[in-house]
Amino acid sequence: MKLAVYGKGGIGKSTTSCNISIALRKRGKKVLQIGCDPKHDSTFTLTGFLIPTIIDTLSSKDYHYEDIWPEDVIYGGYGGVDCVEAGGPPAGAGCGGYVVGETVKLLKELNAFFEYDVILFDVLGDVVCGGFAAPLNYADYCIIVTDNGFDALFAANRIAASVREKARTHPLRLAGLIGNRTSKRDLIDKYVEACPMPVLEVLPLIEEIRISRVKGKTLFEMSNKNNMTSAHMDGSKGDNSTVGVSETPSEDYICNFYLNIADQLLTEPEGVIPRELADKELFTLLSDFYLKI
């Protein structure tokens, strides 16, 4: 199964992608996450550092594919998730689609592309050209990360249009939306009523999700460390200790959202070919909703 994760810039795609990758790994799947962003920080919370990009590695070898080994470009991450960063062209030059194509080509040359149960492409920002829609050429499903806001849903609608276009040439489907860090979902529900598509999950507005990115750790790793610390402290202070008790939701609670998403994806859902709204129609729908509040 190949997944492509899209959404408005800064919406939390990489945080979402990393936690979904671990959730899929916890369900027994062999997972590769491919970051498709010139910032090459998609897999940072999995590996703990900025790994070298495919393009940098190819450049250092003068694009001699035969001189590159899997360990040169594939790095092990937390929970057993393998990680690759495609990188990107120099600022103001080149095409992101070319970079994604070169990444897939190299992984095929290394006999690695088909060795995974799940490959997840984490793609930068909004779809603004055919190049950045390139991961959709390889994906079985697209996942759109959004929130309950005006701009994020505009981006989601544009991505939906790209899915429909790419679905003309191969069996791509939209698996659904993921609402990330939002206290409400009324605008999301209004949008999917007008443009029918599944909502895989809506994650609540929990600070731990943002903090995990700042710490450079996935929520699963934070949960594991906190559980170990609590167990150690409870053991040393006795059963009546309140150490580790928090008024905020635990990381375990948040991780269950990602496990639920993974479980839905592993059923290989039918998905949809979306019919995006026209810009004017969407603007009217969302702006009217705001004005009525």
From Swiss-Prot:
InterPro entries cross-referenced by the UniProt entry: NifH/chlL_CS, NifH/frxC, P-loop_NTPase, Protochlorophyllide_ATP-bd
A GO CC term attached to the entry: chloroplast
Residues noted as binding Mg(2+) in the record, renumbered to the chain: 14
Originating organism: Chlamydomonas reinhardtii (Chlamydomonas smithii)
Catalytic activity field: chlorophyllide a + oxidized 2[4Fe-4S]-[ferredoxin] + 2 ADP + 2 phosphate = protochlorophyllide a + reduced 2[4Fe-4S]-[ferredoxin] + 2 ATP + 2 H2O
Record-given protein name: Light-independent protochlorophyllide reductase iron-sulfur ATP-binding protein
GO molecular function: 4 iron, 4 sulfur cluster binding; ATP binding; metal ion binding; oxidoreductase activity, acting on iron-sulfur proteins as donors; oxidoreductase activity, acting on the CH-CH group of donors, iron-sulfur protein as acceptor
Pathway the protein acts in: Porphyrin-containing compound metabolism; chlorophyll biosynthesis (light-independent)
Keywords: 4Fe-4S, ATP-binding, Chlorophyll biosynthesis, Chloroplast, Iron, Iron-sulfur, Magnesium, Metal-binding, Nucleotide-binding, Oxidoreductase, Photosynthesis, Plastid
Chain's role: Component of the dark-operative protochlorophyllide reductase (DPOR) that uses Mg-ATP and reduced ferredoxin to reduce ring D of protochlorophyllide (Pchlide) to form chlorophyllide a (Chlide). This reaction is light-independent. The L component serves as a unique electron donor to the NB-component of the complex, and binds Mg-ATP.
Higher taxonomy: Eukaryota, Viridiplantae, Chlorophyta, core chlorophytes, Chlorophyceae
CDD domains: Bchl-like (cd02032)
